Regions:
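Short Gly/Thr/Asp-enriched flexible loops that form oxyanion-binding sites at enzyme active sites
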Residues: 69-82
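Catalytic core of DAGKc-family lipid kinases
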Residues: 30, 41, 80-194
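Glycine-rich phosphate/pyrophosphate-binding beta-alpha loops
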Residues: 138, 142, 197-210, 278
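ATP/NTP phosphate-donor binding region
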Residues: 1-62
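Gly/Ser/Thr-rich active-site loops/lids in small-molecule metabolic enzymes
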Residues: 151-161, 212-233
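Glycine-rich beta-strand-to-loop/alpha-helix junction loops that act as flexible
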Residues: 9, 65-67, 90-92
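ATP/nucleoside-binding phosphotransfer catalytic cores, i.e., glycine-rich phosphate-binding loops
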Residues: 17, 184, 190, 215, ...
Length: 300
């Protein structure tokens, strides 16, 4: 097999580059791959632009090496290329929600065995305005932590960097809800909210059951809205999130849709996150699912 590695060298801890060398060496030595081309990113959008150049049949698969942001760029590039190139994932980021949801192996032996077996899973892709995503679009409380935490903090502290940044912002954001309107094919929801997530998988922000009914192959999004609440309601909500039963909380709205139009009815600016990246054009949002939009290499 012939493959292309698209690597974000700034992702992961200090020993991560040695891990990549081990994986590449094993793929060649065990004759799983007979050609491996390497592309290293230097700046934002490099991964997307390289993946966008792919042509059908040029490679048997492309490997996204980095965090959720790198994976997002590769997904955008592959979709835009229309090459239908399968994507394998080596996670080096801080949270790695999509890889967690699919239980993708991260050790050298497990990854190489997965490539050798080469089982493909066709999954849905999301589109928000003119960008594609694989896991989540979110806005509100804690949702912008991913792109505010510096690379140095993530490299040193790992997931703790997110928790510290989020804890500092939580009191301020809790008392500043914003009004949003959500319009789907069948319903309209308008309310004062703290956070919303349009999800493709169950795992968001390191929490494995944020959207307990979500599936990457059902052709719909799961939409989670956390409404304005009082202080007495927050502890039961947090406990519910940890147990995956928060959708029964009175301040939570949970529904599924193929498309959703989202309007910010507040005066203030609300940042939008898609797969850990900042969505520059912001509101209003038109989010739609692209059923069976991409192929992912998964373990048996």
């Amino acid at each position: 097999m012939k493959c292309l590695f698209i690597v974000n060298p700034s992702s992961g801890r200090l020993n991560f580059q040695n891990k990549i060398k081990d994986i590449v060496g094993t793929l060649i030595f065990d004759q799983i791959c007979n050609q491996i081309d390497m592309f290293y990113t230097e700046k934002k959008d490099d991964a997307m632009h390289r993946a966008e150049q792919l042509t059908e049949g040029e490679y048997d698969f492309v490997v996204a090496v980095g965090g959720d942001g790198t994976l997002n760029e590769v997904i955008n590039g592959v979709v835009l290329s229309k090459s239908n190139t399968p994507v394998a994932i080596i996670s080096a980021g801080t949270v790695n929600d999509f890889a967690t949801y699919l239980s993708l192996p991260q050790d050298t032996k497990g990854f190489c065995e997965m490539i050798k077996e080469f089982k493909l899973k066709t999954v849905d892709v999301g589109k928000v305005n003119n960008k594609y995503f694989i896991n989540v679009v979110a806005a509100g409380m804690l949702s912008d932590v991913a792109f505010r935490v510096t690379k140095d903090k993530k490299a040193i502290l790992g997931p703790l960097a997110y928790y510290l940044e989020g804890a500092a912002d939580l009191p301020k954001q809790f008392f500043n809800p914003f009004r949003m309107r959500f319009t789907t094919e069948t319903t309209t929801v308008e309310d004062e909210i703290l956070l919303f997530m349009v999800t493709n998988t169950q795992s968001v922000g390191g929490f494995k059951e944020i959207s307990p009914m979500a599936s990457t192959s059902d052709g719909v999004f799961d939409i989670v809205i956390i409404k304005k609440m009082n202080l007495l309601q927050i502890t039961p909500l947090l406990l519910g999130i940890l147990q995956g039963v928060h959708i029964n909380h009175p301040a939570v709205e949970y529904f599924q849709a193929k498309k959703v139009h989202i309007e910010n009815l507040s005066e203030g600016v609300v940042n939008v996150d898609y797969d850990g990246e900042f969505l520059e054009d912001g509101f209003p949002l038109d989010v739609e699912v692209i059923p069976a939009g991409i192929q992912i290499v998964v373990p048996n």
